[in-house]
Amino acid sequence: MPFTASDICKIIFAVILPPLGVFLERGCNSDLLINILLTILGVGSILASMNPA
């Protein structure tokens, strides 16, 4: 399964701003809220790197 341009953009967004990466992948649901809270607490980057795309 090759990477597409949208996959690369999602990865970049997930590294820079983890909630945006989650929003692009999963939409607006509880995953986004959890990621926003974890980002505020400082662990959102770890969660984003562990989230399979």
Curated annotation (Swiss-Prot):
PROSITE patterns per the UniProt record, alphabetical: UPF0057
Entries under Pfam families matching the protein: Pmp3
Main location: membrane
InterPro entries: PMP3
Disulfide bonds: none
Domain of life: Eukaryota
Membrane-topology annotation of the record: Single-pass membrane protein
Claim: Cell membrane is one of the keywords in the record: yes
Segments passing through the bilayer: 32-52
Record keywords, A-Z: Cell membrane, Membrane, Transmembrane, Transmembrane helix
Cellular localisation: Cell membrane
Any one cellular-component term (Gene Ontology): plasma membrane
Family per record: Belongs to the UPF0057 (PMP3) family.
Function according to Swiss-Prot or TrEMBL: Plays a role in the regulation of membrane potential. Could mediate a proton leak.
Protein name per the record: Plasma membrane proteolipid 3
Organism: Chaetomium globosum (strain ATCC 6205 / CBS 148.51 / DSM 1962 / NBRC 6347 / NRRL 1970) (Soil fungus)
Organism phylogeny: Eukaryota, Fungi, Dikarya, Ascomycota, Pezizomycotina
